[in-house]
A protein has these predicted regions:
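Short, glycine/polar-rich helix-capping loops at beta-to-alpha or helix-loop-helix junctions
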Residues: 179-189
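Cofactor-binding active-site loop characterized by glycine-rich and histidine/acidic residues
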Residues: 19, 24-162
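Glycine-rich beta-alpha junction loops
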Residues: 30, 61-62, 175-176, 205, ...
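Residues at the starts of beta-strands that form the adenosine-phosphate
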Residues: 138, 166-169, 197
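N-terminal capping segment at the start of a domain
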Residues: 3-19, 172-173
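Glycine/aspartate-rich loop-and-adjacent alpha/beta segment that forms the canonical ThDP
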Residues: 190, 197-199, 206-236
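A short alpha/beta connector and helix-capping loop motif
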Residues: 150-174, 219-226
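Flexible loop/turn segments at secondary-structure boundaries
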Residues: 148-149, 177-179, 230-233
């Protein structure tokens, strides 16, 4: 049974493990909901469908919101949430693709999701999967702004732009936790110089997120989802 956005806080509170990385989880909640509710062409009955969209959570150290959304959309039972982080639970502090239905990659070590996403996007093109509806399957990668400090992302960004991976979309949740900042033009300029189209929206405006995440173009796309700074997350 698919649940509503209003039920996510209750689902989140069911996870009582010691290390939920709450700021990392709450910063991604709206993006994750919009993806699974309005954008991604995937569902619990399409886990092995070659034509499904792929979602890669590179920001894997804050999976509580991810698990809540997967439960809300029927990928995992709600009853799993209360065991979060326990020794015999499928729901670890980092998502495991071998244990959690719907999880495409095991993540948590930062800087891996975007390079993997480039490879997956390339692989889908190489397979020549047919267009269903108005587009072929796409790859969506969720990263954090601080994670982009990792050098492994730079090569992936340049390569994706150079070969024009139009089936790749990266969402960067910006809570101003990057070590060095981004200077003039922000994260968007860092991607745009390599041939990406880029947009910035509020990471709490679900309508704006849906519009930005549904857009497509002739090359890879970046959507920066700006949220409250990490130092003040959870405060009014």
């Amino acid at each position: 049974m698919s649940r509503t956005y209003a039920e996510l806080p209750r689902l989140m509170t069911l996870m009582t493990g010691d290390e939920k990385h709450e700021p990392s989880a709450t910063s991604t909640l709206d993006v994750l909901w919009v993806l699974y509710d309005r954008v991604l062409r995937t569902s619990p009955d399409r886990l092995d469908d070659p034509g499904r969209d792929r979602f890669l959570l590179s920001k894997g150290h804050g999976p509580a919101a991810y698990y809540a959304v997967l439960a809300a959309k029927g990928f995992i039972p709600e009853s799993w949430l209360s065991g979060f982080g326990s020794a015999d639970s499928r729901l670890g502090y980092h998502p495991d693709r071998n244990l959690v239905p719907g999880v495409e990659i095991s993540s948590g070590s930062l800087g891996h999701g975007l390079p993997i996403g480039v490879g997956v996007a390339h692989g889908l093109i190489a397979q020549g999967l047919p267009v269903v509806g108005d587009r072929a399957p796409r790859v969506f990668v969720l990263v954090g702004d601080a994670e982009l400090d990792e050098g492994s992302n730079s090569e992936a960004i340049v390569y994706a732009g150079a070969v024009g991976l139009s089936n790749l979309l990266v969402i960067a949740v910006d809570n101003q936790s990057s070590s060095y900042g981004w200077g003039a033009g922000g994260i968007e300029a860092h991607f745009a110089v390599s041939g990406w189209s880029a947009a910035r929206v509020s990471g709490r405006d679900r309508a704006a997120l849906a519009s930005a995440l549904s857009a497509s173009g002739s090359g890879p796309r970046l959507v920066v989802a700006a949220v409250e700074a990490k130092s003040v997350e959870g405060k009014s």
